[in-house]
Amino acid sequence: MSEFSEKMGMEVGNAFKSGYNCSEAIVEAFRKYAGVNIDDNAFRLASGFGGGIGHARNICGALVGCTMVISTLIGRNTPEEKPLKEIYPVTKEFHDRFEKEFGSTMCKDLMPYEFNTRDHLKNCLKLTNRICKFLAEFLEEKGLITV
């Protein structure tokens, strides 16, 4: 594990403990401590994804937060700026690696505890930490972030 991924794991834990959900905590850690340029309006986009989209236990909110960070680094503002064929392979690769590493991309599979219980909060914090480190290592490997 790199020093950067360890630092990001610590920072996502701080964000989570301060009240951010999994998706927000990932985005906050990268915007605040890794210099990823995500403004407040864009940050708000992460709020509804916690708990697998508003506690629906669907797609993992932390995975969505990771995808938001990656998209901020390699995405586009207009269709003319960059073709999607330059963006999708990177986000797809991260998705596939995530699924292989964690066994699923679904909140209900990753977090089998009742929401807002002690077990849920403890395990979601631990999982969000692992996911944040996983993203940090991916970004370093791809040369998408310099530390």
Predicted feature residues:
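Polybasic, low-complexity association/targeting segments
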Residues: 1-18
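C-terminal binding/interaction regions
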Residues: 86-147
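Conserved phosphate/anionic-ligand binding catalytic regions in large, soluble enzymes, centered on
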Residues: 56-65
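Phosphate-handling active-site elements
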Residues: 33-44, 72-90
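Acidic-glycine-rich active-site phosphate/pyrophosphate-binding loop
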Residues: 1-3, 30-48, 101-109
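Transmembrane alpha-helix interface/packing and boundary motifs in multi-pass membrane proteins
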Residues: 48-57
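DPxDG-like acidic metal-binding loop motif
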Residues: 65-73
